[in-house]
Amino acid sequence: MSDMRRREFIALLAGTAATWPRLLSAQPRLPRVGILWHAANEEEEAIYLGAVRRGLSDFGYVEGKNIILENRFPAEIPERFISLAADLAAIKVDILVAINRIAALAAQRATTTIPIIFVAVPDPVGAKLVASLAHPGGNITGLSNFATDLTAKRIELLKEIVPSMSHVALLVNPNDKDTSRVYTEEAQRAVKKLEITLYPVEVRSPSDLEPAFLKMRDRPVDGLAVSQDGLFDATRKNIADLALNHRLPTAVYSRETVDAGALASYGPSNYGIFRRSGYYIDKILKGAKPSKFPVEQPAKFEFIVNLKTAKALGLEVPPTLLARADEVIE
């Protein structure tokens, strides 16, 4: 190569190198969505994380390609919700998604400027997360999973499946004291109407589950209703297994717990609620203001029965009840 050509080549390289920083800075910044879960790891949240990803794909988002998800897992430890929400606010995510009431309150404490979307929060007005469902105000909106008397409905369905049931236990998580109080009051109304006895059982963490079932074994409990709570979703397989081992007919909130082996469920589609979060994320990334974006409540409820579990428990589900079921697992 001649000296002239060598000088031209070096000049070309130098010119190209000089443009690299500008080319890099011109790359579009991917939106970052922080998600504050409640379980300990991604494996425990696999179904619902999959639902969020599916919901995002409905609007053209692919994780790692045109959106980044910053997942955080507090393992049901109240203090961890607060610190992880603060971490997500500190890295300036574009949206902070909070899974359950405790996560939403931690997110609210962490930021007043980053848009917050809560998912599966039973009573956002009562929790003082929003001013009203129609006009949330502030930087928070989202999806509620609450409808009145669902706990009562589960107990009523359980009584139809087990007519001899005279004592029913109710699993509640006292870490969320206001919501657990509402569920307990609903259950008390139901048992009064059915003329049976209620036995509330508190479970604060996964390690409390086995002792809770041992307590139920030592009392005349012949049925179990599980209130809707992130802790019980994350430990659904453990709950289903313990209920079967203790031969305790169990009515739960989520169909995923019935898939894991519980007897029956009644409630909104958890998967559907999590998938719907993709719509909220898309709208807010495109400029919608949380303050004017109404909170969505469930409109459809599913009744699922697991006949395999019924058979293992020696129960015969009435044909009239099976006819009302949205799905029967055989």
Give the location of each predicted region.
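Short hydrophobic alpha-helices and adjacent helix-cap/hinge residues
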Residues: 1-330
